[in-house]
Regions:
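N-terminal glycine-rich phosphate/pyrophosphate-binding loop and immediately adjacent elements
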Residues: 3-138, 468
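Active-site/ligand-binding neighborhood in enzyme catalytic cores
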Residues: 130-240, 247, 456, 460-470
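A glycine-rich dinucleotide-binding beta-alpha-beta segment and adjacent secondary-structure elements
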Residues: 182, 186-196, 372-378, 433-496
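Mid-domain catalytic core of redox enzymes
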Residues: 251-388
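Flavin-binding catalytic cores
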Residues: 328, 366-368, 415-451
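Glycine-rich, aromatic-lined ligand/substrate-binding cores of catalytic
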Residues: 373, 382-425
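A conserved FAD-binding loop/helix module that cradles the flavin
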Residues: 494-514
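Active-site-proximal substrate-binding core of FAD-dependent oxidoreductases
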Residues: 515-544
């Protein structure tokens, strides 16, 4: 086993592997070390019901269409196959729904059932923002967070009709109140902003940016399951000479005299070689875990050390319920039957007033009062035949809850099944309102709590899926900088953007490493802008 590398990446989440694949393709000798026995613990696809149905047990929404990574790494050649739904998302209520189509004109028609004025407003915004989506995503998402770029974020207000000095003091609630008249349109739009995870929609500034960036989101469905994304990334990484070691927990990272690093595996790692050397190290573990691994070395970067020791990972922790069903028909199909074709339906409050109350209750950590109020649902069999078998299908219901549970006895209550059953049963009761004969068609159900997810992904403290809260003091420049003040040390977890399936954090970290080592400008293939590869591929993609 070789000892010396150009770059060592600690952690094989999807963004860690994406970063490593870029660097390996750039000709850098790259090693990835992963504690677990498989990569990408939050991009798993499993047959959890033993029914032969692949279920995405965490990430279900694939944001890769908006990413440059798809094109740069040519993931199609490595097995990645994306399905594009004509109606990828939609918000469901008991008797109504609002479907978001890939064709803006059709979305406007759906909005017009609630408000002709709002339909016109939506089209006006889309017509202004669509030509600039590649630039917006490149500057606001696929670039390192920098104080000088904050003015660019505030300039996004022009697409919604607000000058920068006003936009930076607005939140999502205020903007949607000023843009739209229909409560349903406001509520559905707020849900879309919230799911995008570019900040807290209720906070000034970041909520405004979330509202603008929601218009840039493009999603798809990986055929066969989300696991095909990390599989294609690993194949790409290995094709370009990368080395991946699983069951390889990193104990510590030390600086070498004269430059470079030593990376040590724990004593119980099943490898005779426990030490590796590299010019650069990329930490793809959450900031508190990185802080522990770096030890005293972390103190040499005062910005990272100050942030990491107080890093908040308590606010965005998924509780996910899974339902094996004989049939799935929405109560609102009579309003618009296309909701049956939507792979990513959204539950977003009963009313606009309910949204305002629920958001505050969530901040108050009144968990039992907000059960099922705002949630992502995955009905992937609507577009992917492999997600159904013998007439059975799986519906996933994922909601992020605050983790502390101080009102209910503390975090240990997540291991009290009598308590968490209340949340799961709350999801069932809600779905019984939204889906015809839900209980009669329910064959089996199960769930993962935030603590269950933490056990499955040791870096995701409390089951936090984003490498730390993306709001308040941890928003944009408040996140970890990808370039450490320690020469040769980089971060791809806990940075901007959050670690999602657009692979933005891996892209940003790889860009920083490649630029600093002087290899990026030599890579002619490293050229795609966000969203553009998707537009090129669109004519040949499978569409449903």
């Amino acid at each position: 086993m070789e000892k010396k590398y150009d770059v060592i990446v600690v952690g094989a989440g999807i963004n860690g592997i994406a970063c490593a694949a870029y660097l390996a393709k750039s000709g850098l000798k790259t090693l990835v070390l992963e504690k677990r026995n498989e990569c990408a613990p939050f991009a798993l696809t499993e047959d959890i019901f033993g029914a032969g149905i692949p279920v995405d047990t965490h990430a279900g929404v694939c944001f890769l269409p908006m990413s440059p990574v798809w094109g740069d790494l040519e993931l199609d050649k490595f097995g990645f196959d994306l399905i594009v739904a004509s109606a990828p998302a939609g918000t469901v209520w008991e008797k109504e729904n609002l479907v978001w189509y890939i064709n803006p004109q059709k979305t406007a028609e759906a909005i017009s059932k609630f408000s002709q004025k709002d339909s016109k407003t939506f089209l006006e915004i889309v017509s202004k923002i669509m030509p600039d989506i590649p630039e917006i995503l490149q500057e606001a998402v696929f670039s390192p967070a920098e104080e000088e770029k904050e003015d660019y974020l505030w300039s996004l207000g022009k697409y919604l009709g607000f000058p920068p000095e006003e936009f930076k003091t607005m939140n999502c609630f205020e903007i949607l109140d000023l843009l739209y008249e229909s409560e349903r349109v406001k509520t559905a739009s707020f849900g879309a902003c919230d799911i995008a995870v570019f900040g807290d929609p209720a906070e000034k500034g970041e909520g405004a940016v979330m509202t603008a960036l929601a218009f840039t989101i493009v999603i798809g469905v990986p055929a066969g399951g989300m696991h095909t994304l990390p599989h294609s990334l690993v194949r790409c990484f290995k094709y370009y000479g990368g080395t991946l070691l699983l069951n390889a927990p990193v104990e510590r990272v030390e600086r070498k005299e004269g430059g470079g690093f030593r990376v040590f595996l724990s004593e119980d790692a099943p490898y005779p070689q426990k030490e590796f050397e590299s010019k650069c190290v990329v930490m793809h573990t959450s900031p508190p875990i990185s802080l522990k691994i770096l030890g005293d070395l972390a103190k040499q970067d005062d910005d990272f050390y100050k942030k990491a020791k107080d890093w908040d990972m308590t606010g965005h922790c998924a509780f996910t319920s899974y339902f094996l069903l004989k049939d799935l028909r929405w109560e609102s199909e009579s309003w618009n039957p296309d909701i049956a074709k939507v792979p990513f339906p959204l539950r977003a409050y009963d009313s606009w007033e309910h949204a305002k109350i629920s958001v505050q209750k969530m901040k108050n950590e009144e968990v039992l009062d907000v059960i099922g109020d705002i949630a992502e649902m995955y009905n992937l069999s609507a577009v992917d035949p492999s997600r159904a078998k013998s007439g059975y299908r799986v519906l996933v219901f994922e909601m992020e809850y605050p983790i502390n549970l101080r009102r209910y006895g503390g975090k240990q209550k997540w291991d009290d099944r009598s308590f968490v059953d209340i949340i799961h049963n709350g999801h069932i009761e809600l779905l019984s309102r939204l889906i015809k004969n839900f209980k009669e068609n329910l064959v089996a159900s199960m769930y993962f709590t935030p603590i269950d997810n933490w056990r499955r992904n040791p870096s995701a403290i409390y089951g936090h899926e984003l490498g730390g809260d993306v709001s308040g003091p941890q928003w944009y420049t408040g996140r970890i900088y990808p370039r450490s003040k320690i020469q040769g040390l980089y971060f791809s977890n806990g940075i901007w953007p959050a670690s999602l399936t657009h692979l933005g954090s891996g892209y940003v970290a790889a860009t920083c490493v490649a630029e600093d080592l002087g290899v990026k400008q030599k890579q002619e293939w490293w050229r795609w802008k966000p969203y553009e590869y998707f537009l090129k591929k669109l004519p040949e993609l499978k569409k449903i």
